[in-house]
């Protein structure tokens, strides 16, 4: 049986979203649009978010269905646009994503992560490999 990586993937999403938000903290949109280094850092964070979301979608289908309010598909699609359409990245969309979409995601993640921990604990109990039952 393979190791449950779901909590790790959710942690990657949480960390990358937190990083992206911190990169633009106290920054005006015009400053972001003029700062290539910050743009690159934010874009990389969005790619990490999308990569982890793809792993969750591919490996934990029932979990994503149970958490359909989380924008898994949007995270994956954003990653694909960033990774494969680099010369066509719309920085206005990147800014909007970090300012509006990521705060909402960061509010959702603690409960989603708790559900993943509960599910992992229940699986371990069923397999008899945990004393925390």
Predicted regions and their residues:
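Solvent-exposed interaction patches of small proteins and small membrane subunits
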Residues: 1-133
């Amino acid at each position: 049986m393979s190791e449950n990586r779901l909590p790790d993937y959710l942690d990657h999403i949480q960390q990358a979203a937190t990083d992206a938000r911190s990169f633009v903290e106290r920054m005006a949109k015009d400053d972001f649009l003029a700062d290539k280094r910050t743009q690159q850092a934010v874009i990389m964070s969005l790619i990490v978010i999308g990569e982890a979301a793809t792993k969750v979608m591919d490996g934990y289908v029932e979990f994503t269905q149970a958490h359909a309010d989380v924008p898994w598909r949007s995270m994956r699609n954003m990653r694909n646009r960033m990774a494969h359409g680099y010369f066509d990245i719309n920085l206005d969309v990147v800014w909007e994503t970090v300012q509006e979409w990521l705060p909402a995601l960061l509010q959702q993640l603690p409960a989603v992560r708790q559900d993943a921990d509960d599910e992992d604990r229940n699986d371990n109990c069923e397999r008899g490999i945990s004393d925390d039952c």
